[in-house]
Amino acid sequence: MRLRLAKYLKESDYLLHADMFNTNRFPTLAKTINIGLGESNLLNIAGGLASQHNIVYIYGVAGFIIHRLEQLKFSCRDFGSLSGKIIIVNAGAVGYAKLGAGHSIVDDEPIMKMLNIEFYAPYTLQEFEELLKELEQKDSGIYYIQLGKDYD
């Protein structure tokens, strides 16, 4: 999925990730920043960038992103998404379960709904691509895309 995501990102976009891939081998025009293993920092940086009217994509493991609820709520939802756009693309609700319990999450949908963050769960690559096009047209806000696994 991240390769599909790459083709939709523009030069003005930011892609933040938590040590998910080799940035040098990721073909995108976006400003790509590997924050490392620090999802709290990743969410705070995303909120700051979005607050300056930027479009920020976050790519990370769902379990690690969701468990940083305070940063997600305050930095991203309440601060950054008011003037910019934050799109969280997780690397699999259960797609990384083989790496341990911390890498999977099954309650991300109710958590996003509780936070009033728009939740999407595309099933196929085509649905994922159509969703990216749809979100590109939306105004400022925060959006969460749950992927079953990373198809790339």
Identify what each model region corresponds to.
Residues 1-151:
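Thiamine diphosphate
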